[in-house]
Amino acid sequence: MRNHRTSIFVVLSLVIILNGQSGFLPRAGAESKVHIVYLGEKQHDDPEFVTESHHRMLWSLLGSKEEAHGSMVHSFRHGFSGFAAKLTESQAKKIADLPEVVHVIPDRFYKPATTRTWDYLGLSPTNPKNLLNQTNMGEQMIIGIIDSGVWPESEVFNDNEIGPVPSHWKGGCESGEDFNSSHCNKKLIGAKYFINAFLATHESFNSSESLDFISPRGYNGHGTHVATIAGGSYVPNTSYKGLAGGTVRGGAPRARIAVYKTCWYLDLDIAACSSADILKAMDEAIHDGVDVLSLSLGFEPLYPETDVRDGIATGAFHAVLKGITVVCAAGNAGPAAQTVGNTAPWILTVAATTLDRSFVTPMTLGNNKVILGQAIYTGTEVGFTSLVYPENPGNSNESFSGTCERLLINSNRTMAGKVVLCFTESPYSISVTRAAHYVKRAGGLGVIIAGQPGNVLRPCLDDFPCVAVDYELGTYILFYIRSNGSPVVKIQPSRTLIGQPVGTKVASFSSRGPNPISAAILKPDIAAPGVSILAATTTNTTFNDRGFIFLSGTSMATPTISGIVALLKALHPDWSPAAIRSAIVTTAWRTDPFGEQIFAEGSPRKPADPFDYGGGLVNPEKATKPGLVYDLGLEDYVLYMCSVGYNETSISQLVGKGTVCSYPKPSVLDFNLPSITIPNLKEEVTLPRTLTNVGPLESVYRVAVEPPLGTQVTVTPETLVFNSTTKRVSFKVSVSTTHKINTGYYFGSLTWSDSLHNVTIPLSVRTQLLPYYYDEN
């Protein structure tokens, strides 16, 4: 029997992905480790034939069938061709030299990165003519979730009033530990797990002490949580101990969910997801017939490499060519620049914002001043109690006074029976846990943590009052303590505040652009709510209330977009993944739903720009009728690959047909994205874009430009005319600079408008008069 222990740290590990720490990655064996041998587009429709060809290739390398069989980890045979195998470095180099091999990718490990969201985004079921009801809530769509598994008993997987399984579904439910096919129904229609590559590196995982279930069942609730957000069924009367009350539902509440488990728990607080297992899951999902793939996973940006060595990007490319939109998390390494992950231009990459909701926690000081902090505190009121600031706690160094991290060395006499104020430079998610533990252990009754906004709230163990404020409010409280002989404070339980005056912000943890791999490709693409999202979890998870929990991260924003993509695909089944992305990006809000400026949380807080949120905050209803789209097909992706230096042989194998790159090499600026990013402007640059009409046949659009500061932007022609015979029209954009020095990025926009639609793309331009120059001054 496995020991399925529960710990707060398990929850914390999945709230934030891409935290920049890779120390948990296992060391490879002395002789061999898992490599992905990628062969490009499959050359045969019979999957058994494809797999046999993989074994023959490995046999020819290793010299015997037995060694080939023992080395093989996965065969990719549906969406594309390739395999994962345990190889030494010399074997990997030898097989990489074979002409039929596109490239060999060393296995790497990724990490896993509601009641209000959908009303906030204007996607309410009460409007009979909106996107939800026009698509029957996505009933014929299948959303593939590649994550940490699922808790099938959750109410969000009920199949009440849902019709038969869509006819294009070809997948199934695999049995395993505490999971069998009876756990699937007309909502949860598929469940598989992929562990071979993980086990190749973590052979001891099979021991009885392993936390996780070797099956589609998830030990931690991360996979269940993201599945809820994307396509969970209606569950009324939910809340977290009275906070955020309402009905939990997914973006496409009647869509079907197929779960592909690739993430496994190594320890109480660590999960790892092998890129080879992820790639195998994507291959199976393509075969099974999913319409959308949602991956709340990521890795630090692969700075020295291109997307050819990124397993998710490789699988996503083949999925997109087969009409499947792939939605991925931007990552949680913000607010620093150039931290965005999942940067391949065929992936829809998602940043995270707050909602128009907060959990205010009133604190009344002895001078009757009420401070509204933030917390998820659902305990009883703490009546007027002594308030203390630990001055110089047991150390002669005054710089330690009042710091949350030094509360451990304070005497119990200072904090016992009191509420403690402390200051921190650490991320809130770390400091609050430590400070609450120290104060509670010393007999304190509550803690107020002053620090930089972190956008990550979670309750403290045993409903201990732990309230967050910023430095300004913390300093006010400190002045009150120092100016009063007997300072006191009263802490009331948290309350849910919705709507105005709560503003929308890009979360501080959300990873930022510019794109560190290919600067001319704007990332992230779009933003969606991802802060304090209430959704389902496993019942053994700390901080759950009746199987529901708050989590934050771009992990939560990603399935929000996945649910919207499912609805758009149901409404427009002929739209390509690129057309769907364009519709989402060009119709996004650049202000919040109340018309107010969206800010980006950071140091300092600033107005949000395209490197924070891409096109803006997703606007689902507007995306149904974008008017025009910036579409992409195979030829466009080939242009991109030629422009960034893929060799012709690799491109030919990747796309399954002979390819010759033009000379001179095309510019990546010509790639038909719903954005224009010019990272190195010196001389005037002219670049093309093509728009496809998906609105009224007879349409006339006129251009309006907001040029980035210090640039001149000219569009030719200034008017686009569409009719029954002209559905695609191209235009050119010329950009020049008036700056006399190297600059940072400035931002603007380009909008095509008729009487019904505004088709807006962001402009991001940096002047570089001295090219290839790093300015550290």
Swiss-Prot record:
Residues 117-624 form the Peptidase S8 domain. One of its GO terms (cellular component) is extracellular region. One of its GO terms (molecular function) is serine-type endopeptidase activity. Residues 34-111 form the Inhibitor I9 domain. It is an enzyme of class 3 (hydrolase). Residues 386-481 form the PA domain. It is found in: Secreted. Its main location: secreted. InterPro entries: Peptidase_S8/S53_dom, Peptidase_S8/S53_dom_sf, Peptidase_S8_Ser-AS, Peptidase_S8_subtilisin-rel, Peptidases_S8_3, S8pro/Inhibitor_I9, S8pro/Inhibitor_I9_sf, SBT. Residues 1-22 form the signal peptide. This is Subtilisin-like protease SBT3.7. It comes from Arabidopsis thaliana (Mouse-ear cress).
